[in-house]
A protein has these predicted regions:
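Phosphate-rich cofactor/ligand-interacting catalytic cores and adjacent structured alpha/beta frameworks
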Residues: 1-61, 97-255, 259, 281-287
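Long, hydrophobic/aromatic-enriched structural stretches that serve as scaffold segments
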Residues: 54-103
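Amphipathic alpha-helical interaction segments
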Residues: 69, 88-92, 197-204, 271-272
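Conserved phosphate/anionic-ligand binding catalytic regions in large, soluble enzymes, centered on
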Residues: 78-92, 260-276
Length: 287
């Protein structure tokens, strides 16, 4: 077992996870298989991964500081929000990976989440204001436009009904460990291809959970409709088929979503976090 991991290992794992997600054909989202037609480019995401990684993995920082510094580095580099959701999910994982306490990654992560402070909330609110994410709106409780007087975990509890990233904070990243990582391992066994496995993870999230970015922007009915469409695509997906045949159905779904302006961004964020967690687990056991 090779832990605790170094800051360099964690930064590299995060950077690689971000790039691997771009290599996956993710219908409706940014990827290398088509034109940059969701308002952001692959190059923006590559730059974001490069500049955010050192801040996310810096030793000795709180979760909130990791979030704020990573988001500020990103906005300063590319001029707009590309990775707020990714950073929100990845910062606690980075803290857990750098923690020298006993236990596995999931157990240490639970302790990190339970220990989130008011200071973490203040740093995170500042990051969200800096990023100016789309579809956020105003919340009746603990709105990010003001200064929080609750811990970050308490703020996430208030948001969990409308935001799946917040839900994962309050449920110890259940989506990542019980859905994402299980599907990733299964898909890797089927295809031995990380991009194909990442596509499978993304589709599993989209088919299993209404995407909350779509829900915030277009309503829950639209998110549920996309979820049903994703279920049909996932049912037809064959990781053992040749790439051309496999991608034909995925590209048709991709074009349909983009023609309607529907970007399942939360599903993509969960996919990056899954790839990051998989790499951290592999590093910890020396694989």
């Amino acid at each position: 077992m090779t832990r605790p991991l170094t800051a360099e290992q964690v930064a590299r794992a995060f950077h690689d996870a971000c790039l691997a997600e771009l290599d996956a054909l993710k219908p409706g989202n940014v990827h290398r298989f088509g034109v940059d037609d969701v308002g952001m480019s692959v190059a923006d995401f590559e730059t974001s991964a490069r500049v955010a990684a050192p801040a996310l993995a810096a030793p000795g920082h709180s979760v909130g500081a990791r979030i704020r510094r990573s988001v500020e580095a990103t906005i300063d580099a590319v001029g707009h929000n590309t990775n707020l959701g990714i950073v929100l999910l990845s910062a606690p994982l980075a803290s857990a990976a750098l923690d020298d306490a006993a236990g596995d990654l999931r157990g240490r992560l639970a302790k990190v989440l339970a220990g989130l402070s008011v200071g973490d909330a203040r740093e995170t609110y500042a990051a969200i204001r800096y990023a100016k994410p789309g579809g956020l709106g105003e919340a009746r409780a603990h709105d990010v436009g003001g200064e929080p007087d609750v811990t970050l975990l308490e703020a996430m509890e208030a948001a969990e009904g409308r935001d799946r990233i917040a839900w994962n904070y309050t449920h110890d990243f259940t989506d990542i460990f019980d859905l994402g990582l299980k599907r990733f391992k299964q898909a890797m066994a089927e295809s031995n291809s990380r991009p194909s496995a990442a596509t499978s993870v993304y589709l599993s999230f989209l088919a299993s959970i209404p995407d909350t970015l779509i829900a915030r922007k277009f309503g829950m009915a639209q998110a549920l409709e996309v979820q049903q469409e994703a279920k049909a695509v996932e049912a037809r997906l064959d990781n053992r088929a040749n790439e051309q045949a496999r991608n034909r159905d995925l590209m048709a779904f991709d074009q349909s979503l983009k023609a309607r302006g529907l970007n399942p961004g939360t599903s993509a964020d969960l996919t990056v976090a899954t790839l990051f967690a998989a790499s951290l687990q592999a590093l910890e056991i020396g694989c």
